[in-house]
Structures are given as structure tokens and as C-alpha cells.
Amino acid sequence: MLISYKWLKELVDIDVPSQELAEKMSTTGIEVEGVESPAAGLSKIVVGEVLSCEDVPETHLHVCQVNVGEEERQIVCGAPNVRAGIKVMVALPGARIADNYKIKKGKIRGLESLGMICSLGELGISDSVVPKEFADGIQILPEDAVPGEEVFSYLDLDDEIIELSITPNRADALSMCGVAHEVAAIYDKAVNFKEFTLTETNEAAADALSVSIETDKAPYYAARILDNVTIAPSPQWLQNLLMNEGIRPINNVVDVTNYILLYFGQPMHAFDLDNFEGTDIRVREARAGEKLVTLDGEERDLDVNDLVITVADKPVALAGVMGGQATEISEKSSRVVLEAAVFNGKSIRKTSGRLNLRSESSSRFEKGINVATVNEALDAAASLIAELAGATVRKGIVSAGELDTSDVEVSSTLADVNRVLGTELSYADVEDVFRRLGFGLSGNADSFTVRVPRRRWDITIEADLFEEIARIYGYDRLPTSLPKDDGTAGELTATQKLRRQVRTIAEGAGLTEIITYTLTTPEKAVEFTAQPSNLTELMWPMTVDRSVLRQNMISGILDTVAYNVARKNKNLALYEIGKVFEQTGNPKEELPNEINSFAFALTGLVAEKDFQTAAVPVDFFYAKGILEALFTRLGLQVTYTATSEIASLHPGRTAVISLGDQVLGFLGQVHPVTAKAYDIPETYVAELNLSAIEAALQPATPFVEITKFPAVSRDVALLLKAEVTHQEVVDAIQAAGVKRLTDIKLFDVFSGEKLGLGMKSMAYSLTFQNPEDSLTDEEVARYMEKIQASLEEKVNAEVR
């Protein structure tokens, strides 16, 4: 939020440098992003009076004679709205304007120009806040501007703008009144709020208008009627104030509603009463199929959860978000209905998010407003419009609903205050803090009760009182002390150790770590899962693409693969360590189980072609090798079982990874249909349950002595049926129970007509070693006999 320091000083009697105020506010709980002055960097820009203005033939240029105080200057200007008799902003030769541009004497089309007549944009004012009548031309100054004087004071460019970063819990500071209360408490000053005098006619507003509410999303709705309104530009002071606050001036009525928004934090809307088709204002939820053309000219399809303002049962505004075009204030408007209301913040947030219509009003309703000043803000707006637009105000407020404006009472004790803050404050100190805040206080040190005004709706519990005392007393004055605790040696948890081991293997294999979204679509959430669990959905998702907690990480990684492939980065090896979410109960009543997982995706080439070697593409066994390296590092003996149960994976190139009866994950090729949907080439993926792996890990052995005795290797070639798998052969070898067998390696696979139909040959290298003695040939021969017998029995192998 932007704060005009000039305006703030009207509300609180302070005279400190703006930077000092910014630091003080930051240390008491409201962060200040920075302080800027619109006039910073500008110089030698004065008021000029255009004495004459002549067109340059066959151009858009004008030759102007301009009085700048001491002398008359000729200036060539191309603005369409320049004319004789107006006061303008003139940058003299040597002046500095926006972007540190220096003005020099020059010639334009051969005509001497001794300066520049400036627009607001040329002084660095954003186009988004320049009044529309000056958007394509120069700024015209008030008639009382004195030629030769600096222009800054006429446009309040000499103001200082303080930018606040308001956290959700301090939405009370989204108004000048709220900020004034805060600053007054910091400096122990009184607030000086403006008194708005309202004069009403004898004609009752209730005779011309009725208000009703048909939903609990609108606790209160109030309206006033103004007649004889004259639409015109706002006075210069109001335009200056709005521009400094980042709001474009429109006209006197709309500008007053924005002024009240800034002053009270109360969103308002003005309707053209002459465009009402009835006399009954109703606040209700939209009906299916209803539409509304909003002020921006867009036709909006309304949702049944949207809150609307209707007249004659037709929507005329999206409550708290944007008004309708049909009842917009225009130059012809003479009768105006002013609206001030309280709407449900969640409803407003959902509507503004769905329609992507964010505004100053919607953000305030979302975060909360001061319900105690709704009617006061409405009266103030009516008073200002009467003053600036010559309007008459009908008697009374037409309203529906009720508001609880009573103070909130919160109790505590002095002992609790000092215990929590670590201070030795007296009851008088506590009294002083709440006096400065403008809160009521009763009781004594043993027990006191604070009466919190409705303007501070963030204070509801005892802890909030402690925070207020600490803020105003001063965080820098709180005593500091070191924790009274014995130091302990830091170490990694089992989960952290496992993650480090996984990262070491993955990155050693050339994989790059990425982080993908935990939230995804309902469809992608259950991809790559054989048995999907219940979906855990957000109640108020920002978008459908991020509405459900993921049950796998592969779909997110494939989105990243697709993004890179589309940008010609085709050789990819990506991995992620994160959480997936399993919901076995009712998602609305129970939290999902969070499972630590590791996943990767490989596509493209392992090695590119060069003059010596052919290109090596990624395949199933390359991906499996990465997992084998990981399981070897972890000391786990896993099995791979072919499966076709995971629909998103290739049925002939997919394996489930198990440790005993525990399924740890899967490995496989992305199904061609799924790959086409992601628009990616042939890709291999794997995902492991790290939580299950962590539970299966054995305590690390501190040290194992390296044997001094040599290992002995024997090769064996087996004739097998074609359907026998490598894993079945390994299981058969291990079933022989040879304790001295330390390694099994497959080094050759062969099939052909010589072996016979449906047969294949597999050759293995078997390694034996005794850590305590050298093995003899007789011992190794006995081991081989046992292994051969087991192979013949288990897989019907024939030793070649």
C-alpha cells in the first residue's frame, strides 16, 4: 500500500524525516518497502502560461509563446491539447526530467524551442494513473498557478510516498485511518481525523429504494441516494492525492469512492440511479446461466457461488469485485446510489480468483474491513460528493442486515506478560501501551481486561496482547538471554542420510535434480500408480492444474521433460526427491500419509555419436543399472518382476521392484500412448518408496576386515528354455546354499538355430572366496556340483 506522507501528517501531528518513520514502522511490525518522492531527480521545471499558440503548417506541431515568470519563451510543442490561456509545466533548458534526461535549447523543423512543455509521463508519472483527459497530451495546471514557480507543489510531486508491505494479519493498516492509529501509537500522539458534515433533505431515501439480503455471505448492506449530481473532474488536490496513491482520477463521484476506500479502508461503489429498472436492491447468490457485463466491458458468466447485487432481480454488480456497465456513472449521471457493505471474504476471493479480477476493493474484503465505520464511511462519501458535485443527499440510510460493532474483550495478567516477554514491566507500563493504542483497559496487575476496538479485528486472544505490548514497548528494549540448555552433537537423521546417499548415486550417474509441483490435476495425480488412493483436493485451488496432491512424482517430471524437449533439449536425465501423498481415509476428515519418494526419468542418448563410437540410446537396462548401483550402495538385495498392471507404462518393459514381500517401486518405459499425450520421445522412468527403503535398512557395519586370501572364479554356460529369466537363474544358484559364493555375473546370452527352437544359452561367472583361508580346487569343485544340481532342479538347466 502507498502512503502519502503529506496526508499522513494531516492525520497525526508528527514532523520526523520519512526515512526515520519508515524504520520505526518496520521495527514495530509493519514492513516498509521503501520511501520515494515523485520529484526526485527532477529540476528546473516551472509553471508556464501559454500566451499564444500557432499551428505549424502541415505538421502536428504548435509554436507557443510561454510566460515562465521573468521572461517570455518560444517553445515548440506537439501536444494536441495545448492552447493559449492555459497554465502548463515547462522544463527550462538545463532541466532534468524523467530518466535523468536533460533539456537543451534546440530547433524543431527549423523553429527555435527554448524549453519543453511537459506531460505527466515526461515527469516519470505512470501512465496508469494519469487522468484520461491528459493521457495523450500535456498536463494543464490550476488557473491560480503562478508562472515561474516550481510546479511540484501544485501537483504534490514534492510529497514523499511510503510503500508498505501489509501482512494478512494487519489488514487494518490498509487504510489511512489504520496507519494513522499505528503511527500515533508509535510516537504517542493523538489522531486528528477529518469531520465530515452531512446535510440531508427532507425527502427520505427509503421512499425511493429498498434493500434486502438473501444470503449469509453479506452480513450488512447500506445505501444512500444523492440527487442533482454534477459529474465533473475532481479538484486538483484530490487528483494529486489519488495519483500519489497509485489510482487514476476518473471524475468527482468515482474519485470520492476511491478516496473513502483509502481513508477508511471501506470499499464503495456508485450506481447511476436513473439506469435502475426497479427500486429494490437485493443481495443474493447468482443463478446458473446468469451473465453480467462488468465495467471493463467484458461479459461474465456467473457462477452459483458468486455474490451479486441485483435490481429488479437482474444483476447490476459483482459484489465486492466490480460493478456492472449498465449502471456505470457517466457524464450524464445526475442521481447516484452510494453503496457500502460487508461481504464474506472467502466468497469474494473465490469470485475474483475465478474471473481473474483483482482490485483494491476485493483485496480488502478478502482480508477484512472495519465493520464499525461502514455507515461513517458512507456518510463521509455522501458529504464529499455534496461538496464537490453540488449534490443533495436524501434523508437516511437504506440498509439490511446487522453489524456487531462492540469492542472485543481479551484478558491477561501482568505475570503472564512478563513471563512470555522476559521483561519486568509494571502495570503502569502496560497501561501506557494500551492508552497509546487507543484500547480500553480495566483491572489491575493480577488480572486486567483490554477492550479492543473493532478497527483491530486481528486481536482476539491473549497472545495478541503480548505482541502489541512488545511492539509498542519496543522489540529492541526486550532483554536478551541465551538458551539454558546443554549442547548436543549434531548429526543427520536416518532420512537425511538416505537422501544424501540417493543424491550421491543419482548425480554420480549424471542425473540432474529438479523440484516439481506437489499439486497437480486429478488425472495426473493417479498416473503411474497400480492402486490409486483417494484424492486429496484443495477446497479453494488457485487453478485446476494445481488442485490435487500428487500420488506419484513421475507425471511432474514428465512435464519438465516435455518442456525441455519442446525447446530442443532432448538428452535428459532428471531426478527428484520429494513426497507423494496416500489417502486411505476420508480426505475431508483425515490427513494423507506423506511418503518420501525418489523418481527419475531418462530420455535421449547416453552417449552421442562421434568418429569412433556409435550413439548409445537410453534403454531399460541403463535405467536398471542406476537402481542396481543404488541398491548395492544400500546393501539391499531386491528382485525385479515383470508387470503390466501400471497402465501408464509399457506392458512389456516394466518391472515391479520388491524386497521380500515389500514392494519398493517400479521401473519401466513410459507407455507410447502416454508419451504421445506428453509429447515426449521414448522415456524410461523409475520411482522408489524411500520410506519403505529406510525401514528396511540394516545398521551400518562400522568395519569389515578385507580378506588377505584370493578369490576364485569359475565360468558356467547353461542351456535353458527361452522363457527362463536371469533372476530365476540367480535364485537357483543362491538356493544351492554355497556360503563362499560372493558374486554372480551374467556375461553372455546367446540364442539361435544351433541351440534348438525355444532354447537359449546364458553364461555366468561365479566368484568364491573364503575370508579365513585359501580355497582349494576340490572345495570349488564341490561348490560347483551343488550349484549345478540346484540349477538342474530349479530351472531345468543343462550345463554345456
From Swiss-Prot:
GO BP annotations, alphabetical order: phenylalanyl-tRNA aminoacylation
Residue numbers binding Mg(2+): D458, D464, E467, E468
Broad enzyme group: ligase
Xref: InterPro entries: aa-tRNA-synth_II/BPL/LPL, B3/B4_tRNA-bd, DNA-bd_dom_put_sf, Fdx_antiC-bd, Fdx_antiC-bd_sf, NA-bd_OB-fold, Phe-tRNA-ligase_IIc_bsu, Phe-tRNA-ligase_IIc_bsu_bact
Residues of the FDX-ACB domain: 707-800
Chief localisation class: cytoplasm
GO molecular function, one term: tRNA binding
Cofactor: Mg(2+)
GO cellular component, one term: phenylalanine-tRNA ligase complex
Domain tRNA-binding positions: 39-152
Pfam families: B3_4 (PF03483), B5 (PF03484), FDX-ACB (PF03147), tRNA_bind (PF01588), tRNA_synthFbeta (PF17759)
Comment on bound cofactor: Binds 2 magnesium ions per tetramer.
Cysteine disulfide partners in this protein: none
Signal peptide: none
Keywords: Aminoacyl-tRNA synthetase, ATP-binding, Cytoplasm, Ligase, Magnesium, Metal-binding, Nucleotide-binding, Protein biosynthesis, RNA-binding, tRNA-binding
Gene3D superfamilies, alphabetized: 3.30.56.10, Bira Bifunctional Protein, Domain 2, Ferrodoxin-fold anticodon-binding domain, Nucleic acid-binding proteins, Phenylalanyl-trna Synthetase, Chain B, domain 3
HAMAP family for the chain: Phe_tRNA_synth_beta1
Similarity-based family: Belongs to the phenylalanyl-tRNA synthetase beta subunit family. Type 1 subfamily.
Description of how the protein assembles with itself and partners: Tetramer of two alpha and two beta subunits.
NCBIfam families listed in its UniProt record: pheT_bact, YtpR
Protein name per UniProt: Phenylalanine--tRNA ligase beta subunit
